Amino acid sequence: MKPERFASISRSGALLAINLLFLMVWGFTGIGKLLAGVPPWFGDKFGATFMAKFPGLTAAFWILAISEVAAFGLAALALVTGEFAGRRAPQFLRLMLVWSLFVFVQLGFGQWLTSDYNATAQLFAYFAGTLVALIYVEGRTESGEQTVSKI
């Protein structure tokens, strides 16, 4: 197998794995929130924070749920359009990864508000992993030229 072909197959496999990972993460969390609604513990955990006043606990929960479902939708679009195959630029995948960064900021902010610093640290790691995935996805131009070294 030619090195160029091997590199193309490897990149496609990595893009597919990134796409499937985030599809799974946001699918389970976002759709789970839509189906289950606001859990009973949500008020206990966040009721003493300013989120109880603004935007309100119910609104905060649904904003987060919609954010996660939006990330799931972008991941699904990236998969359905076959961006991992390399026939087109991974635009939906990039957008989903950038959106995911903001979702992790939302999640981390909530944990920080409740002084749950272990969970905040975990979310920081998820944020960092997402940033690494984004750098990898943006690592080549549409013509295949390497761009990571230019960052």
Located regions from the model:
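Extended, low-polarity transmembrane helix blocks
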Residues: M1-G32, F61-I66, A70-I151
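Membrane-interface interhelical connector segments
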Residues: L34-G56
